[in-house]
């Protein structure tokens, strides 16, 4: 079947992946028939990579049924450490649960191998070392030696962890969060500089550690697949976007795919029509893809009071990663209910909004006037309430 889909090499794995992929998380709330409709439309469009991190049994079985008889057409990203315990998602490094959950993934997807075996959700440097130096990585290496997983990857939202993984020589590819809101920060202390008409040229406002990560991965042959490319839908609305101007799916996709090392953006699809709106990227004009001019023309006041996750507020005396807490809170507010993965991410932080002592030293450093201590209380109320 001829499609307009383009394919890219996923780093040194040797795998050619569609530049738009299926991030299957949204399928969790759908019936088997609805899941099959989305998967079928993806296949018709030339999509050949899917990520299934979710341990929930029903969605795994529904995806397995949808790809039945066509398994070899799909490159599957499956996760080690995402488990289902007492009716809910639990991220764990306890090997009993890890092994059971991975066996369940194979059974429900009706396959005897996973193309990309992901060390799931490693966001802190200390945890990275524990994972890589202990039985967790050893288990992944054993599965690879047996041919049960073909390549070892890691999912992380932290550029420092991602860089360590890339340099380790043991991680072949990364699943990493990429979008303009996560990447950009003020280019200078002078806010008017950031909103110059030619700001978008060269995108000088990307956080240095993230720009360095993309270049590092390109140099080392560590391919990237992208999660959170739409920032949970937040970027599609001028009201909810930190830029106060709306971006389209095509613009978000183009942003991700123009980062070095990125091979595929894994978008979430609720319906076949959502697939179509993403795949429209393949035939879009340069004007339709242009995100830089949209961001450059954002009103100069757009950021005021809005967290852009730039990190200028650090350091926090209690060790709170303020940008991460705000990011998780903003993503959670985009959903009718707080997703289990976001709640687990929040609970896994070494310090969270509940640890804020309202010293407000961060607020003095914030270039956008964000009421940080208030945001920390809001985040903690949101996630604590979701956990009950």
Predicted features and spans:
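N-terminal binding-site loop/beta-alpha segment at the start of enzyme catalytic domains
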Residues: 1-78, 112, 139, 145
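Active-site groove signature of glycoside hydrolases
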Residues: 104-127
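Acidic-and-aromatic substrate-binding clefts and catalytic sites of carbohydrate-active enzymes
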Residues: 27-33, 51-61, 83-85, 92-93, ...
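Active-site mouth loops of central-metabolism enzymes
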Residues: 21-33, 80-99, 129, 237-246
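Conserved, mostly hydrophobic/aromatic
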Residues: 10, 22, 42, 50, ...
